Amino acid sequence: VGYEKLVGLISELHTEELDPEDLNRLFMEFVEKVTDLFGFITAVYCDSAEQVLIRGLRTAAAQRNKGDLKIANAKKNRINDRIFCFTSLVAQNRFLYTELCETLEDALSMAVWKPDTVELERLDDGTSDIDTLDGFEYSYERDMKKYMNHVE
């Protein structure tokens, strides 16, 4: 597909209390699920504020013979830039997602702007799934310019 369309393939949300070992196990189960369904993963981008957890994910990947999987810090572009890129793709019918993206669909449908402010700021008060939105945005933010500059 190149940069013609952005396609959400699969999403999961785990709301239970997780310790680092649980996180590593669930992460590797997700990696296996994605590779079984779609063939391969080249990179995973994580919230840079979680360096200890990122090191744990790298260790878990290496222990499961997935040491070639790039697990790196997200670029963390401005949130509004990520949102505007995504909404532009939606407006141009350039965003698709599979039936395996129920949690992403829910997160996108519940995202709202913070009320009572003139600034465009996404509401982050626990009423919507910001973690899924951030994770999804981290997956395409490094390529935003390529998506926005794509000409058919």
Regions found by a protein language model. Name each.
Residues E141-E152:
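Acidic two-metal-ion nuclease catalytic site recognized across multiple nuclease folds
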